[in-house]
Amino acid sequence: MTGRWSPRLLAGLLAALVLSGCALLVPEDEREAQYEAFLEERAELRDWSVAGRAALRAEGEAVSLSLRWEQRGEVYTINLSGPFGAGAVRIEGQPGRVTLRDGAGQSATAQSPEELLAAQTGHQLPVTALRDWIVGRPADGLEVDELSLDRVGRPDRLEQAGWRVDFQGWTDVDGVDLPSRVDLTRGSTQMRVALSGWSRSDD
């Protein structure tokens, strides 16, 4: 063995590298068409539920929560609890009215989930926008300041209302790609949401 590569072997290797590179480079117009189809698919996604965990860091505090989110059109229910079920709360919302109930039977009401959580926790969290981000699309009614797509036309990163949203993973749910992890960042506030147990009832 001389350790030298034959011209034929080199040519074959170069051809394989070129072809594999071409397979990864999707034309921009094709990715945009894939993204439009992706958005149309999400427009039909009105009824769903998902479980997961959320890790929040804000103003020197760190909180880890279990969550279950059920969405039925414009009506939603979010159940949150700390480790071992501690501090369980339930948020029930519809346009113009949101109610938070804790395990002791106490309740509070506001016009939006952002207003409610700010009053109860002191944190500004984009719950209304998260309803859209959690299924992988830009939030309705907010300007998109930045958007990048992955090679199959799904959002890779977007920015809205000062929040940077990074989609870190996807899972197939009955033929629809839905996020398995979403990271949110705004200033010193960071929130990581790991999602599992997706269920659709929009068929």
UniProtKB/Swiss-Prot annotation:
UniProt cross-references to SUPFAM superfamilies, sorted A to Z: Prokaryotic lipoproteins and lipoprotein localization factors
Lipidation (N-palmitoyl cysteine): C22
Residues where lipid is bound covalently (S-diacylglycerol cysteine): C22
Domain of life: Bacteria
Pfam families: LolB
Primary location class: membrane
Compartments reported by the entry: Cell outer membrane
Record keywords: Cell outer membrane, Chaperone, Lipoprotein, Membrane, Palmitate, Protein transport, Signal, Transport
Membrane topology, record value: Lipid-anchor
Protein's UniProt keywords contain Protein transport: yes
Function: Plays a critical role in the incorporation of lipoproteins in the outer membrane after they are released by the LolA protein.
Family: Belongs to the LolB family.
Quaternary assembly: Monomer.
Protein name per the record: Outer-membrane lipoprotein LolB
Species assigned in the record: Halorhodospira halophila (strain DSM 244 / SL1) (Ectothiorhodospira halophila (strain DSM 244 / SL1))
Lineage per the UniProt record: Bacteria, Pseudomonadati, Pseudomonadota, Gammaproteobacteria, Chromatiales
